[in-house]
Amino acid sequence: VEQICDEAGYTRGAFYSNFESKDELCAAILHDRHDAVIAATRTTADAMPATFTSSSDAADAAVDRYLALQRVDARWPVVSAELRLHALRSQEFRPTYLSWHEEIREQVVQIFSLALEQRGLHLPVPVPQAIDLMEGVSEVASFSAKLRGMPADTETAANLKAMLAALLGVAG
């Protein structure tokens, strides 16, 4: 509990005065993260130009905008891993985590699908699969950078841009 509080930016006192269990703390962290992800995704999609000169330009613009809106604490990759591990270990917390992840995924898929449709863009894979691929790329890049003591944004951005440009380019 102390490590999760510390990594998530909560004090130990805040935990004891606001949460009755580790699961409640974890659910609150997930709720806060949900709102940030959906807001950044929606704002990014709404701000994207109607046309692009290349799939690389489209990917660069989308990823830069999204990451600028997502400026999360550098500790988030560790917090995220801790939350997933807690869900794996805790039968009680697992449904909360799975519900949160599915809800975010569904909303991101809807926003991303609409943005692609409005711009006449298509992917070579279903949008949910593309979202999973980008989530995996982002996670690996974040952890790799973190392990090497580097800021995660640079590597994450480069890898996400490459993945999205490849998906858009193959479909284009």
Regions found by a protein language model. Give the residues of each.
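Secondary-structure edge/capping motif, primarily at the C-terminal ends of alpha-helices
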Residues: 48, 84-88, 141, 145-149
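Aromatic/pi-system hotspot detector in well-structured domains
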Residues: 15, 30, 74, 83
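Hydrophobic alpha-helical connector segments
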Residues: 28, 41-75, 127-134
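Hydrophobic/aromatic-rich alpha-helical bundle segments in the mid-to-C-terminal region
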Residues: 94-98, 116-167, 171-172
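Helix-turn-helix
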Residues: 1-28
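Short loop-to-helix capping motifs
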Residues: 21, 86-91
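Amphipathic alpha-helical packing segments from all-alpha helical-bundle domains
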Residues: 38, 71-81, 91-118, 129, ...
